[in-house]
Amino acid sequence: TDLRYSTGNRGFMAKVLWVQNLWIEFYGVMTISALLRDHGHQSEISFGSEEEIVESIHRHKPDCIAFSCMTVQWQWAKEVTTAIKRSGIETPIVMGGIHATMYPEDAISHPDVDIICLNEGEYPMLELVQALDSGRGYSTIENLWIRQNGKVIRNPARPKLTAPELNALPFADRALYKKYDHFKNYPF
């Protein structure tokens, strides 16, 4: 059984499965999800134990597994990425968020993290998902560090988004979280 859930030229949208352990809405995840959605891609989110997350990956069959991780979550994220890879899943794992941005060498040094996204992730993630969907390479996408053939490709940072570029982003995809009872009455 091929446990790398890649669309590779099938002409359908790509899927990203966000994995998180904190029951709070992450604004960066919601803005990236909205941008992906507006370009025909799909995002889902998974909470739970390592076993529940692995089961969720099998159920959703994503093209990319993504974490937005604060340093306080780093130990948990390492354990979950190891459990995912140990289960035989080969889908690329992307680690973004403040930990990857502030401590990129630490983030990419974990052997079960395939890609880290530094700084703003909206357009790097869109480019990555488009590349995964089309079967194109993604080793030159700015803001991404990629583990490939045992080496790390450290792409340069792209310029930060300007105020007009930030204003042009779609509204946050709050529906990503609202399917969970915990968030249905969330006041924001």
Residue spans of the language-model regions?
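Radical SAM [4Fe-4S] cluster-binding motif and immediate context
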Residues: S6, P164-N167, F171-F188
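Generic start-of-chain signal for non-secretory N-termini
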Residues: G11-W18, G28
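Glycine- and acidic-residue-enriched helix-capping/strand-helix junction motifs
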Residues: W23-Y27
